[in-house]
Swiss-Prot record:
Intracellular or extracellular location(s): Cytoplasm
InterPro entries for the chain: Exonuclease_RNaseT/DNA_pol3, Oligoribonuclease, RNaseH-like_sf, RNaseH_sf
GO MF terms, alphabetically ordered: 3'-5'-RNA exonuclease activity; nucleic acid binding
BP GO annotations: DNA metabolic process
Role summary: 3'-to-5' exoribonuclease specific for small oligoribonucleotides.
Main location: cytoplasm
Protein name (database record): Oligoribonuclease
Gene Ontology cellular-component annotations: cytoplasm
Domain of life: Bacteria
Amino acid sequence: MTVSAQNLVWIDMEMTGLDPEQNVVLEIATIVTDKDLNVLAEGPVIAIHQSDEELAKMDDWNVNTHTNSGLVARVKASQHDEAQAVAETLDFIRQWVPERTSPLCGNSIGQDRRFMVKHMSDLEAFFHYRNVDVSTIKELVRRWQPALLDQFKKSGTHQALDDIRESIAELQFYRSHVFKI
């Protein structure tokens, strides 16, 4: 394992909803890649215990999605709180990148960052202020080369580690088909 400022840290979180003021984090996962998007390591996948009161705030989509994926059961059984999840995630990330060097990478990663600011500020502070947001590229491709979108399909499991793997694969696809780098 080599610490490098060129490595990229990918994070995905599943939440009870979209509003960090009203909702909470259910799960967090992390993957580190090198600058060429080769996976170096998969970090911990942590379900974060939440009270029945917090879980009851979920809308139907979140209840169905997170129940069907098994996440609600994992959250109820989890012994991890947010602080423990942050500590374990940071312990993993520090093995691969210096502080404030990696942009936060993922799909719609600005949403995850909003939840970090509210609920996991120590984790958010570890990252560079920049983001590598794959969904930004997707939105541009949708407008400039829409036929390409049919060539890449995601399974959409809404499980954090799977979502990161798909985000990396999606950026690899755009790199070879859009940027041709």
